[in-house]
């Protein structure tokens, strides 16, 4: 197996990394924690869904912050290229595919199926790979300590021990076969019972066959009897069909005869009624002509009455209009005066409007003047000068206090400074190391120090006295200032109040002055408009005198001479129409003597005739109906006679049939009884046949069972032979020499492989020997034939033999072994041993075609021909490929 490529997506620290292995020795190099070993974990995960990490769940392999991860690995074996896709966490999406001629052929899906397929293709599992060609960090030589357990696991010796145990699978299988032989004894008993049961069933079948023959004979007799009655019944049934048809036809004819007889019952009465109303109906047309004449005559009378009413209205209207025209002429002089007054009034309306507005404004101003005077009388003039002077005096005193306080505070600060300086001198007297006074320069003895202390105390008392006096003056001034500040605030509030009152007083005086000026202006304007106002009032008086004449004139103003002429012409036309209608009236009276002279009598006559017409129209409807019925009844009479003849003919045909309803029902009962008997016989026959078939089936089934039981009985000799062979196998496995034989075979093969490998390394050994006795020790032989334990070898030699042993085991167990993976092999190695390891790795390339080396050691780059650099950027591993020329 050669690994060609791996892709890691959201796997451990890799976000999306693709690594191609193109060299014989591929060196993956980078700092610790860069993500190098994650690539080896990816190879293991891709092949076996496992890693070298101690994790709880595969989901922990997903890159932090991501929801899913994926590993894809491409490898070659026997000339074929395979692609494995693994999903971290989700097993159902795992696949293995064969890449052939540009096509992807899926070989297996889901995690377990894919694992089995990979094991089938590679020929080995995870345990073998981890024990041989995948070497973890710093564990090159661990093969020496793990060798006994590895060999025992690889050779499955523990499985052989399990086989020969008393509760092992061989013992269990012998027990199963023995139980099977015991069960065959019970089968013999079952076989005898089954054969006896078959004999019993055969006897019952013979009895059933005899019973079946008897019942079939009885069924034949009843069937023949039923056929005889059916023949007679079918003949009578055919006659009955004809009888039923004729009876049905006779029933229809009888019904029709009854219906026609019922309808012909009142024929004579209807004929009499028809003849009676025939003469009355003839009056209908005569009365309709009278109604037409009355309607025309009535129209003439209505028009005459209407014209007379119109003439009366026109005459009255003409009289009224003539009177109104006369009054209109009488009022024309008054109307003329009114129009002249109105014209002048309109000319003066603008002036009058101005006068009223000014007068209204003047009234408002006079009221305001009076109100302002009253309010001013209530207010007294306020003088604020005395308050302003007082505030100024207080403010001046506050300023004086502020200036004095400033001087006092400065003086207090100066005194406090002097006091601190004096205290400092007093306190430092004891610490003076020089024997001279720092103030006067005289020799400084204890007496001089005491004197200085007394002088300082006097100065301090004086200073405290001055400071206290100053503080008392400061406190007094501050108190005075606070009182003055309070006084000034009160005075300022009073000043604000008086200033406000003064402002109100002065504002009202100013407003009164403005109102007086406006009053004078308005009075002058009124004087200029007074003459117009007086003229306007005079015109208004005259208007009142003429308004009634004006309104009366307006009422009569719509009457004109032309209107009266039109009205007179209209009156003449109406009189002319009235004359024409009166002529028509006289003509109608002369021609139709039945017409009354007045409209009321005419209306009464019209109502009587219309009522008679309504009665006659109803009679005519009845007349027409009776006429149709009489015509129809004459046809019914003829139909009645024909139906009576048809009735006689049907009665004769029914009599000729000779049908007997009594015999028909008798035959029906006999046939029904025989059919039921025959059905019962058939049911019994069906039961007997069913029982017969069931017993035959039972016999067939039991015969099959007997055949199977006999076949099982034949197994007894085979089972005994199987038990014998298993017992012999168990005896062979119990032989202690078997394990030794197997171990020797494997030891020889591994020894040959190890010696073949180390021959390619530049070592001073002639051979390696493996001793499986006890702890499975390893020894080497020098060129001189000396036997040396591996623990006595140098570090480089031990590494060489460890690699050789791993490769030898892999070669013995794996046909397709061709890749060696070393993860941080230089851990715990000194510089010399690291160099030796490089030489060993270079030599190993002659044995294994592909080596993948993971390291942080820059020296190991010398061993590689294809360099893969890994570095961590943030939380993500990045890969860069570079070649290296040795």
From Swiss-Prot:
Source organism phylogeny: Archaea, Thermoproteota, Thermoprotei, Sulfolobales, Sulfolobaceae
Domain Zinc-hook per the UniProt entry, residue ranges: 391-489
Top-level taxonomic group: Archaea
UniProt keyword terms in alphabetical order: ATP-binding, Coiled coil, DNA damage, DNA repair, Hydrolase, Metal-binding, Nucleotide-binding, Zinc
Name of the molecule in the record: DNA double-strand break repair Rad50 ATPase
CC cofactor note: Binds 1 zinc ion per homodimer.
Function: Part of the Rad50/Mre11 complex, which is involved in the early steps of DNA double-strand break (DSB) repair. The complex may facilitate opening of the processed DNA ends to aid in the recruitment of HerA and NurA. Rad50 controls the balance between DNA end bridging and DNA resection via ATP-dependent structural rearrangements of the Rad50/Mre11 complex.
Subunit structure as annotated in this protein's UniProt entry: Homodimer. Forms a heterotetramer composed of two Mre11 subunits and two Rad50 subunits. Interacts with Mre11 and HerA.
GO terms of molecular function: ATP binding; ATP hydrolysis activity; zinc ion binding
Single GO BP term: double-strand break repair
Binding site for ATP: 32-38, 137
Domain notes: The two conserved Cys that bind zinc constitute the zinc-hook, which separates the large intramolecular coiled coil regions. The 2 Cys residues coordinate one molecule of zinc with the help of the 2 Cys residues of the zinc-hook of another Rad50 molecule, thereby forming a V-shaped homodimer.
């Amino acid at each position: 197996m050669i690994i060609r490529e791996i892709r890691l997506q959201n796997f451990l620290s890799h976000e999306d990394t693709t690594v191609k292995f193109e060299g014989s020795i591929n060196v993956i190099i980078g700092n610790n924690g860069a993500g190098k070993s994650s690539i080896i974990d990816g190879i293991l995960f891709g092949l076996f869904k496992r890693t070298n990490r101690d994790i709880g769940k595969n989901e922990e392999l997903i890159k932090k912050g991501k929801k899913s991860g994926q590993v894809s690995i491409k490898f070659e074996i026997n000339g074929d290229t395979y692609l494995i896709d693994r999903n971290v966490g989700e097993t159902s999406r795992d696949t293995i595919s064969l890449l052939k001629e540009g096509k992807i052929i899926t070989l297996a899906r889901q995690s377990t199926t894919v694992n089995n397929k990979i094991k089938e293709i590679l020929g080995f599992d995870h345990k073998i790979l981890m024990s041989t060609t995948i070497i973890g960090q710093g564990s090159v030589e661990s093969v020496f300590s793990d060798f006994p357990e590895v060999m025992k696991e690889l050779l499955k010796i523990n499985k052989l021990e399990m086989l020969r145990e008393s509760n092992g699978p061989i013992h269990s299988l012998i027990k199963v076969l023995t139980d099977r032989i015991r069960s065959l004894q019970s089968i013999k008993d079952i076989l005898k019972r089954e054969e006896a049961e078959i004999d019993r069933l055969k006897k019952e079948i013979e009895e059933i066959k005899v019973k079946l023959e008897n019942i079939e004979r009885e069924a034949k007799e009843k069937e023949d009897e039923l056929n005889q009655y059916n023949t007679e019944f079918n003949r009578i049934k055919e006659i009955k069909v004809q009888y039923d048809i004729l009876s049905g036809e006779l029933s229809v004819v009888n019904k029709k005869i009854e219906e026609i007889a019922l309808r012909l019952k009142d024929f004579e009465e209807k004929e009499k009624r028809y003849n009676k109303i025939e003469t009355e109906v003839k009056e209908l047309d005569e009365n309709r002509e009278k109604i037409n004449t009355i309607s025309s005559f009535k129209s003439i009378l209505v028009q005459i009455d209407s014209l007379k009413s119109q003439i009366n209205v026109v005459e009255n209207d003409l009289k009224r209009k003539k009177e109104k025209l006369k009054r209109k002429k009488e009022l024309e002089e008054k109307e003329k005066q009114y129009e002249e007054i109105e014209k002048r009034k309109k000319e003066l309306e603008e002036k009058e409007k101005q006068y009223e507005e000014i007068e209204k404004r003047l009234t408002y101003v006079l009221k305001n003047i009076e109100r302002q005077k009253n309010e001013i009388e209530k207010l007294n003039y306020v003088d604020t000068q005395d308050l302003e002077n007082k505030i100024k005096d207080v403010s001046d005193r506050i300023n004086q206090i502020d200036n004095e306080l400033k001087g006092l505070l400065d003086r207090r600060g100066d005194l406090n400074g002097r006091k601190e300086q004096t205290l400092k001198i007093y306190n430092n007297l004891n610490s003076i190391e020089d024997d001279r006074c720092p103030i006067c320069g005289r020799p400084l003895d204890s007496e001089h120090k005491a004197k200085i202390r007394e002088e300082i105390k006097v100065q301090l008392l004086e200073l405290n006295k001055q400071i206290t006096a100053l503080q008392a003056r400061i406190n007094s001034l501050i108190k005075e200032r606070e009182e003055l500040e309070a006084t000034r605030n009160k005075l300022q509030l009073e000043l604000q109040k008086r200033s406000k009152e003064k402002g109100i007083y002065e504002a009202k005086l100013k407003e009164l002055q403005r109102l007086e000026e406006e009053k004078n202006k308005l009075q002058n304007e009124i004087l200029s408009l007074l003459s117009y106002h007086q003229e306007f009032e005079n015109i208004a008086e005259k208007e009142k005198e003429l308004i009634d004449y004006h309104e009366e004139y307006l009422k009569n103003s719509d009457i004109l001479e032309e209107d009266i002429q039109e009205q007179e012409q209209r009156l003449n036309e109406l009189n002319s129409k009235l004359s024409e209608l009166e002529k028509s009236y006289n003509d109608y009276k002369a021609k139709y003597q039945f017409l009354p002279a007045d409209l009321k009598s005419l209306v009464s006559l019209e109502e009587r005739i219309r009522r008679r017409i309504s009665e006659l129209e109803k009679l005519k409807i009845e007349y027409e109906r009776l006429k149709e019925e009489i015509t129809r009844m004459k046809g019914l009479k003829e139909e009645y006679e024909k139906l009576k003849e048809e009735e006689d003919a049907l009665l004769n045909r029914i009599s000729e049939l000779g049908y007997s309803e009594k015999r028909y029902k008798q035959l029906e009962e006999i046939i029904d009884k025989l059919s039921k008997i025959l059905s019962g016989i058939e049911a019994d026959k069906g039961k007997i046949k069913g029982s017969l078939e069931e017993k035959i089936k039972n016999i067939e089934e039991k015969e099959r069972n007997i055949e199977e039981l006999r076949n099982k009985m034949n197994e007894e000799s085979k089972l005994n032979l199987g038990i014998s062979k298993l017992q012999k196998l168990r005896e062979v496995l119990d032989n202690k020499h078997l394990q030794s034989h197997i171990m020797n075979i494997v030891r020889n093969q591994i020894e040959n492989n190890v010696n073949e490998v180390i021959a390619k390394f530049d070592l001073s050994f002639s051979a390696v020997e493996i001793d499986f006795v006890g702890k499975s020790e390893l020894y080497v032989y020098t060129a001189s034939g000396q036997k040396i334990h591996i623990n006595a070898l140098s570090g480089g030699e031990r590494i060489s033999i460890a690699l050789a042993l791993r490769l030898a085991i892999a070669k013995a167990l794996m046909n397709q072994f061709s890749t060696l993976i070393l993860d941080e092999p230089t851990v715990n190695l000194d510089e010399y041993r690291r160099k030796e390891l490089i030489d060993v790795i270079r030599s190993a390339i002659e044995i294994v075609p592909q080596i993948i080396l993971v390291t942080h050691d820059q020296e190991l780059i010398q061993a590689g021909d294809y360099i893969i650099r890994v570095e961590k950027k943030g939380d993500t591993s990045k890969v860069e490929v570079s070649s290296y020329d040795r």
